């Protein structure tokens, strides 16, 4: 596969103690993609028995072998990221460059309160995912679960339960409250949500999931909305959401 201009390829690996020091499935994934290397490989640290030093050594090995240019973390705490950075400095290894974190209207604290400190201290940026909260922030649910939505797909029972929960209904009400703001900006609530995620300090990109080219183009329209998100507009959105993160200091 040829590398198109402006495209960034990434992979995610899951570590277990037995898989160290070689991340599992990485070469197989590269073969399936017909690539010699990816731009960035993310380490999903799901096994607390994997020593941090060995994870950092494994990712350094991946980069030194030419399989990736950089490495990042996924679903790591700020403390774990700082520990990895300290290990890299102590043993002359390669530190992570970014964290992959969930971020949307109803999941804010980590990206707004924890990761900016890492960005300023050690330069670790953020790649965020689920800007639409698995479709909850699209106004398509509106208190019900349509037959065509993801919540009806096998394996997504948890999403259906979330949509139908009291908390889910409250969140859907907040989404409906945002409709006038979206209309004022000439966009959909989904575009507003993606632009809102991009506004956060240290966020380099937002991961999108789409099922059609039309949906992709609609989501990309959020880039036009970003320039319209004035400080006053953000304050108004915060007031409607009622869940702005606050420093504990």
UniProtKB/Swiss-Prot annotation:
It is found in: Cytoplasm. It comes from the Eukaryota. Its main location: cytoplasm. GO terms for molecular function: oxidoreductase activity; voltage-gated potassium channel activity. It is an enzyme of class 1 (oxidoreductase). NADP(+) binds at residues 44, 74-75, 100, 129-134, 140, 150, 209, 211, 215, 218. The keyword Methyltransferase does not apply. Keywords: Cytoplasm, Ion channel, Ion transport, NADP, Oxidoreductase, Potassium, Potassium transport, Transport, Voltage-gated channel. GO terms for cellular component: cytoplasm; monoatomic ion channel complex. Pfam families: Aldo_ket_red (PF00248). Strong expression in brain, with highest levels in neocortical and allocortical regions, hippocampus, olfactory bulb and cerebellum. Also strong in kidney. Weak expression in lung, skeletal muscle and heart. Its EC number is 1.1.1.-. Forms heteromultimeric complex with alpha subunits. Interacts with KCNA5 and KCNB2. Regulatory subunit of the voltage-gated potassium (Kv) channels composed of pore-forming and potassium-conducting alpha subunits and of regulatory beta subunit. The beta-3/KCNAB3 subunit may mediate closure of potassium channels. Enhances the expression of Kv2.2/KCNB2 alpha subunit-containing Kv channels but not Kv2.1/KCNB1. May display nicotinamide adenine dinucleotide phosphate (NADPH)-dependent aldoketoreductase activity. The binding of oxidized and reduced NADP(H) cofactors may be required for the regulation of potassium channel activity. Belongs to the shaker potassium channel beta subunit family. This is Voltage-gated potassium channel subunit beta-3. It comes from Mus musculus (Mouse). The gene is Kcnab3.
